[in-house]
């Protein structure tokens, strides 16, 4: 069973998994089985489960839990980033909270996010390769150059920068780019890593 099945399980528009045998093991899981598997996955990959469930609007509580997990991670690695490491206690905590909140919002974006769908590929992540289409006489697709194949635009890091400057007014754009933004980017990446870990664990416990 994969994490995407959890989202379908919680969707009222999707058929619930039942006890009747189906084509795959995850399809034959009962509601009780699914909840038990989620509990096991949460005990081993709480960050990833909270991040995913919050991302798919399954729980508002999970959104806050994911941000809290991300803040803990940010505190742990902040010493590697000069622009954050030198900050005083209260200011540092507030900056990390801002970075974690914006990073999680970026992770949550998808083609379904209002205003985020790529204008070139309309959320598919694919675009027509005009040169090869003309050369071969048939439609040839390629990865969308605008969105890099994901189907949507990322949240502009400038939004996080503006929020951080409310706490650090003298933070210049170049300094942000060199000493703070790398941490912001690392937080976004960590969300995806934790989701992948949770996905693998959930798959393992439902085999």
Curated annotation (Swiss-Prot):
A zinc finger (unnamed) spans 118-147. Changing residue 134 to K: Increased binding to QBE and increased suppressor activity. Zn(2+) binds at residues 118, 121, 144, 147. Keywords: DNA-binding, Host-virus interaction, Metal-binding, Transcription, Transcription regulation, Transcription termination, Zinc, Zinc-finger. Coiled coil: none annotated. One of its GO terms (molecular function) is zinc ion binding. Residues 171-192 bind DNA. Residues 1-28 are annotated as: Disordered. The record marks 101, 160, 165 as: Interaction with host rpoB. The keyword Plastid does not apply. One of its GO terms (biological process) is DNA-templated transcription termination. The keyword Zinc-finger applies. The record marks 134 as: Interaction with host RNA polymerase sigma factor RPOD. It holds the Pfam family Antiterm. HAMAP family: Antitermination_lambda. Belongs to the phage antitermination Q type 2 family. Mediates the switch from middle to viral late gene expression by associating with host RNA polymerase (RNAP) so that the latter can read without pausing and through transcription terminators preceding late genes. Competes with host factor sigma 70 for binding to RPOB, the beta-subunit of host RNAP. To join the elongation complex, binds a specific DNA Q-binding element (QBE) and interacts with RNAP that is paused during early elongation. Participates in the lysis-lysogeny decision by activating the expression of the late lytic genes. Interacts with host RPOB (via flap domain); this interaction renders host RNAP resistant to transcription pausing and allows it to read through termination signals. Interacts with host RNA polymerase sigma factor RPOD (via domain-4). Interacts with host NUSA (via N-terminus and AR2 domain); this interaction releases the autoinhibition of NUSA. This is Antitermination protein Q.
């Amino acid at each position: 069973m994969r994490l995407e099945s959890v989202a379908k399980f919680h969707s009222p528009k999707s058929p619930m998994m039942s006890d009747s045998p189906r084509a795959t093991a995850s399809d034959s899981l009962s509601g009780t089985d699914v909840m038990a598997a989620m509990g096991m996955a949460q005990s081993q990959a709480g960050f990833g489960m909270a991040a995913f469930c919050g991302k798919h609007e399954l729980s508002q509580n999970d959104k806050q839990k994911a941000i809290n997990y991300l803040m803990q991670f940010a505190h742990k690695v902040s010493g590697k980033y000069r622009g954050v490491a030198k900050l005083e206690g209260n200011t540092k905590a507030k900056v990390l909270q801002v970075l974690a909140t914006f990073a999680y919002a970026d992770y949550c974006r998808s083609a379904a996010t209002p205003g985020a769908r790529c204008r070139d590929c309309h959320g598919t992540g694919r675009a027509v390769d005009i040169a090869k289409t003309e050369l071969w006489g048939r439609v040839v697709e390629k990865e969308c150059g605008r969105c890099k194949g994901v189907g949507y635009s990322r949240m502009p890091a400038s939004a996080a920068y503006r929020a951080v400057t409310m706490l650090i007014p003298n933070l210049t754009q170049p300094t942000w780019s060199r000493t703070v933004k790398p941490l912001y980017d690392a937080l976004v990446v960590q969300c995806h890593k934790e989701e992948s870990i949770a996905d693998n664990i959930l798959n393992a416990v439902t085999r």
